[in-house]
């Protein structure tokens, strides 16, 4: 540990018990990693070692709370009697006035949410088609179109509701508890039942669930506010001092009166401001609306061409309206929103089963395209559990003596144990001597960590009655304690300091240990190195992330040396710098463009504060990257909201969860990478369906448009409607398909998407034209297939077969046989194919005019031939770099970009200096 980082508390800073976990664990909590030792052995060990002290602690807890006068505050919130608390009638009255103690969620009106499934460019076109059918008194088409619109809305609404139900169940498992005094009795309640004026009982390990004030006189609490303010050290709280929701009590016991709940708390107000800053339509919705708008324009262009041809042929108005209805139905895919929503909702439910709560469905698309993941270190890359290394002892001191002394300088209360105490107690399994001796010592007085002296002190009595003072803490501060008592031999002093420097350079935190036996001088004993080791799966996950084209940047509040050592162990890059080099505090002399280059090239930053996280995300986004950000505290909320995908990690505060797009209940980076793979699979399903559905619309627009213009013939309107229905019904099962995941981030490459869809649509149109002209000749018995039946049924079957089979082409990254479709998708397509064949054979829409089996078999053969041609075409275009260049062109480089970056950073620095000057 470096000199300036040589604080005992630095070892606690990112330790697992810094902020005690909620008393109620999620019902679906992820299983611990194989090499992570559970804390159950700690409880058993404490029971064995400190049974008398634990009993005394329990007796203390049973005492009635001490009364104390509250400090005057506005209204009557602090006038509650501290012994009796509120009455139930007062609780009900205040709950009606102030509501539940929870941040308000934007509750959507179910009816309005359902109605919104009828809003959008695609839906408007279908509604226009329904009105047109009603005007033509074509009640069959009118009913079918309305049913199609209703099916789209019902499927989308039900799927989102089911996914939301799963998320709500998981959220319930995260509920906190609160110990409240009401009507003179102590009750344990759900935290959301707390109201202003309630008296809460605080104990070591309590997570404070509302804002309030300490009301116990002469009390000394230490509260961890790192989730709110980012302060690494616990804050001292005395009578009258404010407390904030999401803080954790580290030391002491007392009472507080609740002054604010829910959205009125500091956390709630911060979350409200962050959420208010977010607005606008999601990127995915913009993509769908853009596709619908372009298809609508194509429909209008097709109708213009048809109307122009009809003008010269003097076509009747009623016939023109039929043309309009047909082209409108086939030109805009009404099922597109429903299928895509279903795909994302099913994916969200699957992610929820893997402990990832998707707050909004569009986050799935964003996560699939993430190129850079800015990850915190503690708990995500590491275990968030301290482990001890090999002790360094000075001459004449054994490792057993050092461990025994360090364990004596530990809390005797189970809830008072910090991460360092737990680490030492776990280490006793490897030190049987100190373990057997520990119970023979009696602790006379224990002084918790003092941020001034940076050490923990315990006064104990040995079995022979000798009194010993034991300390552990920041190595150089422990050394100072000994030096103030007597000079230390030069060789011991040199070896001790060298070891401190060596451990710091290797990324270890270190603790100095010393003791003073009654009647003797202080004795320096040695150093115990400790570290937060990487999770067992992190190195493998980092390697997998690289394979997936994802860059992981470490952003940590730890010292740079610690961050570098962790990065080295994980196989990450070691270009990790102090966040101060970003120059956000008004300093720094790098031009803005160089700051952008610096952030882009860095593998991470140490000694990071929330403003650094926000700046890193902003810079990467301005460079064109899609960025994901992990966080857990209130101060992380702006960064989580700023990122393209905000990720609240396990144990995150309500504010962080509210600001995030995805909330993870399972610890570690592997859960995030697994979710990323799943999101890419979901994106692939959506992308393949959109290509498929646009191609179908273009296919029918091209074929029927030319057929109307050249031949002045129109397919039966009922069959046109059923073609549209079959195209969407068959592919609803795409949500359950065995989709591959891309090995690189995926985005909506719209030029390429439209290029592929257009070419495939043209191939389909040519295939349909050839089938029609070769199988159906002018006059009886002049076609290739004799006794073929009715033209509409032949066209209907060929169009249905080739369109349904297209999904097997677009769903694969390689040849169509390279990936086996799911049984749901295969079954749905087969069922629709059989139904379409029955339509053709029995002529259900042409008064029973049947088509021969021979003709039907020939149609299947023609359709399979067309399928092979479009499969080959799609594969060639998908693998062609030239096609991509033709669709996207060369990337344009902005000459002014670096100048703009220089200006932005200069303005930020000037603003910061100005604020400092005003202060």
Curated annotation (Swiss-Prot):
Enzyme class, first EC level, given as a word: translocase
UniProt keyword terms in alphabetical order: ATP-binding, Cell membrane, Hydrogen ion transport, Ion transport, Magnesium, Membrane, Metal-binding, Nucleotide-binding, Phosphoprotein, Translocase, Transmembrane, Transmembrane helix, Transport
Broad class of where this protein is predominantly found: membrane
Binding-site list for Mg(2+): 632, 636
PROSITE patterns for the chain: ATPASE_E1_E2
Residues passing through the membrane, by range: 114-134, 139-158, 290-311, 323-345, 718-736, 753-772, 825-845, 859-875
Enzyme Commission number, as recorded: 7.1.2.1
Family: Belongs to the cation transport ATPase (P-type) (TC 3.A.3) family. Type IIIA subfamily.
Protein role: The plasma membrane ATPase of plants and fungi is a hydrogen ion pump. The proton gradient it generates drives the active transport of nutrients by H(+)-symport. The resulting external acidification and/or internal alkinization may mediate growth responses.
Name of the protein in question: Plasma membrane ATPase 1
Species whose genome carries this gene: Schizosaccharomyces pombe (strain 972 / ATCC 24843) (Fission yeast)
């Amino acid at each position: 540990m470096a000199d300036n980082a040589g604080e005992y508390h630095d070892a606690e800073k990112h330790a697992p018990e810094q902020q005690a976990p909620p008393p109620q664990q999620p019902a679906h909590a992820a299983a611990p990693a194989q090499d992570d030792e559970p804390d159950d052995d700690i409880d058993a060990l404490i029971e064995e070692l400190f049974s008398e002290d634990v009993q005394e602690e329990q007796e203390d807890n049973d005492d009635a709370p001490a009364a104390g006068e509250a400090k005057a505050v506005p209204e009557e919130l602090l006038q509650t009697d501290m012994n009796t608390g509120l009455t139930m009638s007062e609780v009900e009255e205040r709950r009606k006035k102030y509501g539940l103690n929870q941040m308000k969620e934007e509750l959507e009106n179910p009816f309005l949410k359902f109605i919104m499934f009828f809003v959008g460019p695609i839906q408007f076109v279908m509604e226009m088609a329904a009105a047109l059918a009603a005007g033509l008194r074509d009640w069959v088409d009118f009913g079918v179109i309305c049913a199609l619109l209703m099916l789209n809305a019902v499927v989308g609404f039900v799927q989102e509701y089911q996914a939301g139900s799963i998320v709500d169940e998981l959220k319930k498992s995260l509920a906190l508890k609160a110990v409240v005094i009401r009507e003179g009795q102590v009750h344990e309640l759900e935290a959301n039942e707390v109201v202003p004026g309630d008296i809460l009982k605080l104990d070591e390990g309590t997570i404070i669930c509302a804002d309030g004030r300490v009301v116990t006189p002469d009390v000394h609490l230490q509260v961890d506010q790192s989730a709110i303010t980012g302060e690494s050290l616990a804050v001292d709280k005395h009578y009258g001092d404010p407390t904030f929701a999401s803080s954790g009590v580290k030391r002491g016991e007392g009472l507080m009166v609740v002054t604010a709940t829910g959205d009125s708390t500091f956390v709630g107000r911060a979350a409200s401001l962050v959420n208010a800053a977010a607005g606008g339509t999601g990127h995915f919705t913009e993509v769908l609306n853009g596709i619908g708008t372009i298809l609508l324009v194509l429909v209008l262009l097709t109708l213009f061409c048809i109307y122009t041809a009809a003008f010269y042929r003097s076509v009747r108005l009623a016939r023109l309206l039929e043309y309009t209805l047909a082209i409108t139905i086939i030109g805009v895919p009404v099922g597109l929103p429903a299928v895509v929503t279903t795909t994302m909702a099913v994916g969200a439910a699957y992610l929820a089963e893997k402990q990832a709560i998707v707050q909004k469905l569009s986050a799935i698309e964003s996560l699939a395209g993430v190129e850079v993941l800015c990850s915190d270190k503690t708990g995500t890359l590491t275990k968030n559990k301290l482990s001890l290394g090999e002790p360094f002892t000075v001459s004449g001191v054994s490792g057993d003596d050092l461990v025994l002394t360090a364990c004596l300088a530990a809390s005797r209360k189970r809830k008072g144990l910090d991460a360092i105490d737990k680490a030492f107690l776990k280490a006793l399994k490897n030190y049987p001597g100190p373990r057997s001796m520990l119970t023979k010592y009696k602790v006379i007085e224990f002084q918790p960590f003092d941020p001034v002296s940076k050490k923990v002190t315990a006064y104990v009595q040995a079995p022979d009655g000798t009194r010993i003072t034991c300390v552990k803490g920041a190595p150089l501060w422990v050394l100072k304690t000994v030096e103030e008592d007597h000079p230390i031999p030069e060789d011991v002093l040199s070896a001790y300091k060298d070891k401190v420097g060596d451990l710091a350079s290797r990324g270890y935190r270190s603790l100095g240990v010393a003791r003073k036996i009654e009647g003797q001088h202080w004795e320096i004993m040695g150093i115990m190195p400790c570290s937060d080791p990487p999770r067992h799966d992190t190195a493998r996950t980092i390697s997998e992330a690289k394979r997936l084209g994802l860059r992981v940047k470490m952003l940590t509040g730890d010292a740079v040396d610690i961050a570098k050592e962790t990065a080295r162990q994980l196989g990450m890059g070691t270009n990790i710098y102090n966040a101060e080099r970003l120059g956000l505090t008004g300093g720094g002399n790098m031009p803005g463009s160089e700051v952008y280059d610096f952030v882009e090239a860095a593998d991470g930053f140490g000694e990071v504060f929330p403003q650094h996280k926000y700046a890193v995300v902003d810079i990467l986004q301005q460079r064109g990257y899609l960025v994901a950000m992990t966080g857990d505290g209130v101060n992380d909320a702006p960064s989580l909201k700023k990122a393209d995908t905000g990720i609240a990690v396990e144990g995150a505060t309500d504010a962080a969860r509210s600001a995030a797009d995805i909330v993870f209940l399972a610890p570690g980076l592997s859960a995030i990478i697994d979710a990323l793979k799943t999101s890419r699979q979901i994106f692939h399903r959506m992308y393949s369906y959109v290509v498929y559905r646009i191609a179908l619309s273009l296919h029918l627009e091209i074929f029927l448009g030319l057929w109307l213009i050249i031949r002045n013939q129109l397919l039966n309107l009922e069959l046109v409607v059923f073609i549209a229905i079959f195209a969407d019904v068959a592919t609803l099962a795409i949500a359950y398909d065995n989709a591959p995941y891309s090995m690189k981030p995926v985005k909506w490459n719209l030029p390429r998407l439209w290029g592929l869809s257009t070419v495939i649509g043209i191939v389909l149109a040519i295939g349909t034209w050839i089938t029609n002209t070769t199988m159906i000749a002018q006059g009886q018995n002049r076609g290739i297939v004799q006794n073929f039946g009715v033209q509409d049924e032949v066209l209907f079957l060929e169009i249905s077969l080739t369109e349904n089979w297209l999904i097997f082409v677009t769903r694969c990254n390689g040849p169509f046989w390279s990936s086996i479709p799911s049984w749901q998708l295969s079954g749905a397509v087969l069922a629709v194919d059989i139904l379409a064949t029955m339509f053709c054979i029995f002529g259900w829409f042409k008064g029973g005019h049947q088509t021969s089996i021979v003709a039907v078999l020939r149609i299947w053969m023609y359709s399979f031939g067309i399928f092979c041609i479009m499969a080959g075409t799609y594969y060639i275009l998908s693998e062609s770099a030239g096609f991509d260049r033709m669709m996207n062109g060369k990337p344009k480089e902005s000459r002014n970009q670096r100048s703009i970056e220089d200006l932005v950073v200069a303005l930020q620095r000037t603003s910061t200096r100005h604020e400092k000057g005003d202060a």
